[in-house]
Design a protein with these regions (language model features):
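RNA-binding accessory domains that recognize and position tRNA/RNA substrates
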Residues: 12-246
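Glycine-rich beta-strand-to-loop/alpha-helix junction loops that act as flexible
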Residues: 253-257
Length: 257
């Protein structure tokens, strides 16, 4: 039997507004959570990989606009996340796919956003928004299902600036842990036969690495482990003395917000 999963994107349609601090506004409809959120407006030109973007700790504090016109067509799955939760403050798209169809999908994008209290807005002229941000630069913004356009602009103007915010501290691991996650081998599975994929065999770990978590992505950890490193992940505030006491062969500094 086929393992293809197709989920209808059923969600409550509510009018929503995206407002920028310079007074520019865009109308649309919300999906996922409702309410009001603020963050720095930015854009991403990737044609795929929206789940990785949403869960990338580098986007903490930001409202991300996707320039690709159709988003959500393959749903959300457990393997593609870059962290344990979403980090975007809001998500702006042109059109939400009416169907999420993939044998790997476990829930729709609106369901995922509802679960994690993330506000999405669709129906926005993302081309016009992106051109505006490209020329004017990143700026504070607000998405709301409950404020007027003028109120949303004021909310954006009164929101916190990115400068001086310690997004690393809030997103770093609170406990030291060893990474032992496996990597999928997507060339082997045959979905039509019910086989949903295999994991690559992990090689023997020959070297010990300590990785500072400044907003590290799971895929970085997967690649390090897959290439023969035993990886211990530590909080961003861990002292050099504590690191040296672990006697590592190397130290890895992750990227982050």
């Amino acid at each position: 039997p086929s393992t293809v999963r197709a989920h209808c994107q059923r969600h409550l349609h509510m009018k929503a507004i995206l407002a920028l601090e310079d007074g520019r506004t865009f109308e649309g409809e919300s999906f996922g959570h409702t309410g009001t959120t603020t963050g720095e407006a930015c854009f991403n030109t990737s044609m795929t990989g929206y789940q990785e973007i949403i869960t990338d700790p580098s986007y903490r504090g930001q409202i991300v606009t996707m320039t690709y016109p159709l988003i959500g067509n393959y749903g959300i799955n457990p393997e593609d996340a870059e962290s344990s939760q979403p980090h975007v403050r809001g998500f702006v798209i042109g059109e939400l796919s009416p169907v999420a169809s993939s044998w790997r999908s476990r829930q729709t994008l609106p369901e995922y956003f509802s679960e994690h209290n993330v506000i999405g807005i669709e129906g926005v002229d993302t081309r016009a928004l992106t051109k505006h941000l490209r020329s004017a630069g990143a700026m504070r913004s607000c998405i709301s299902t409950e404020l007027s356009a003028d109120e949303a602009v004021k909310a954006a103007q009164n929101s916190s600036l990115m400068e001086g915010c310690d997004f690393v501290k809030g997103g770093s691991t609170s406990e030291t842990y060893n990474w032992d996650g496996e990597s999928r081998d997507w060339t082997i599975p045959n979905p039509s036969s019910g086989q949903e994929g295999n994991y690559r065999e992990l090689p023997e770990a020959k070297y010990n690495i300590v990785a500072y978590d400044f907003g590290i992505k799971y895929d970085i950890l997967r690649h390090l482990r897959q290439n023969g490193f035993n990886v211990k992940v530590v909080n961003s505030c861990t002292s050099a003395e504590d690191i040296l006491a672990m006697n590592p062969d190397g130290v890895f500094l992750s990227n982050g917000p």
